[in-house]
Every structure is written in C-alpha cells, then in structure tokens.
C-alpha cells in the first residue's frame, strides 16, 4: 500500500513473494522429486510410483544421472523457497520533501547485508529517468538520475505496469520531487 501526502511519498516494493515465483518453485520441486524417484526406482529395479515407470532405465548411467539432476533441482528449489520465505527484494521507496531525503530500502538474503538502505538528498537529484524498451514485452524502467550521473533504479524489470502507467508514475514522481523528467 502506497502512502502519499503533500511532503511524504512512501511506495511499497514487492519482492520474491509473487505467485509466479511460488509456481516455479513448486514446478522445480515436483520435477526434481520425479527425477529422484525414477533414479531410485532404476537402482532398486522396482517402480516406486506406478505412473513413473523405470523398468527400461538402467541405473548406470541413466538412473545415476537422473538422481544427480533430481538433487540439483531439489537444491535449486530450496534456494527459490528460501528467497520466497525471506521475501528477498521487498522493501519501500520513501521520498521525504520536508527533510529533503530519499530513502530506498530492500531486504536481501540473511547475513551481514540483509538490510540494504540507500539514502541521498533530494537536492542531489538531477532528474527522473524513464527508459522504455519497445520489444515483445514492452518493459520500462524508472530510475533517479543523480547529479554525478549515477542512476538509481526504482522499479524492477518484473513489475507489471504497462507503458502508460509507467509514464504516469514517472511524471507524478517528477512533479512530487520538482525535478525534470527525461526519457528514451
């Protein structure tokens, strides 16, 4: 939920807890378990699950390779589930005109740099930059261009805004911060 007043604008950023991430983590987990079960079935020379026949698969080398693929897929799935659990990439963008500070906060993986916070002054902002990529997916990116020519991205590539919403959001932010907008 976004909060907006005359001097303060806080927008929430969605991280890894998206339906698509849960879907793909589940697909990878089920696929990995299927590979492991078929590999183990070929080792035992007996079908563990009836709809995954393994009688025609010899353990060496096919069953062994399937076990390795299953273990690799299981660890990839584990990584995806932990990223979802920790909500990596979520956070907020805070624009405070009263104090003259912009604060960008994101959650990372556990460890020394779990909390990622970038703060800079509003007076250091040169412009709001809107970069549009006109390809099949027609994605855009909103970023803050600082006076030292450094760009700080505000939106993620996977955000589901269409181009007109992206332009409107960039224009609102430029009006709020009272800086120009540049785009290409």
From Swiss-Prot:
It is a multi-pass membrane protein. GO terms for biological process: photosynthesis. It holds the Pfam family Ycf4. It is found in: Plastid, Chloroplast thylakoid membrane. Keywords: Chloroplast, Membrane, Photosynthesis, Plastid, Thylakoid, Transmembrane, Transmembrane helix. InterPro entries: PSI_Ycf4_assembly. The keyword Membrane applies. The chain crosses the membrane at residues 22-42, 64-84. GO terms for cellular component: chloroplast thylakoid membrane; photosystem I. Seems to be required for the assembly of the photosystem I complex. NCBIfam families: PRK02542.1 (NF002712). Belongs to the Ycf4 family. This is Photosystem I assembly protein Ycf4. It comes from Staurastrum punctulatum (Green alga). The gene is ycf4.
């Amino acid at each position: 939920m976004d909060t907006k007043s005359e001097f303060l604008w806080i927008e929430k950023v969605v991280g890894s807890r998206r339906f698509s991430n849960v879907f793909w983590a589940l697909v990878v987990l089920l696929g990995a378990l299927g590979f492991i079960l078929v590999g183990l079935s070929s080792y035992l020379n007996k079908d563990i699950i009836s709809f995954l026949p393994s009688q025609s698969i010899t353990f060496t080398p096919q069953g062994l390779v399937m076990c390795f693929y299953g273990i690799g897929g299981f660890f990839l799935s584990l990584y995806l589930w932990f990223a979802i659990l920790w909500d990596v990439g979520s956070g907020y963008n805070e624009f405070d005109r009263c104090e003259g500070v912009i604060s960008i906060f994101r959650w990372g993986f556990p460890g020394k740099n779990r909390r990622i916070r970038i703060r800079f002054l509003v007076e250091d902002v040169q412009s709001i930059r809107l970069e549009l990529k006109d390809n099949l997916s027609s994605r855009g990116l909103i970023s803050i261009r600082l006076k030292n020519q450094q760009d700080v991205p505000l939106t993620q590539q996977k955000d589901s805004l269409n181009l007109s919403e992206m332009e409107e959001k960039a224009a609102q932010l430029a009006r709020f911060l009272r800086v120009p907008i540049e785009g290409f």
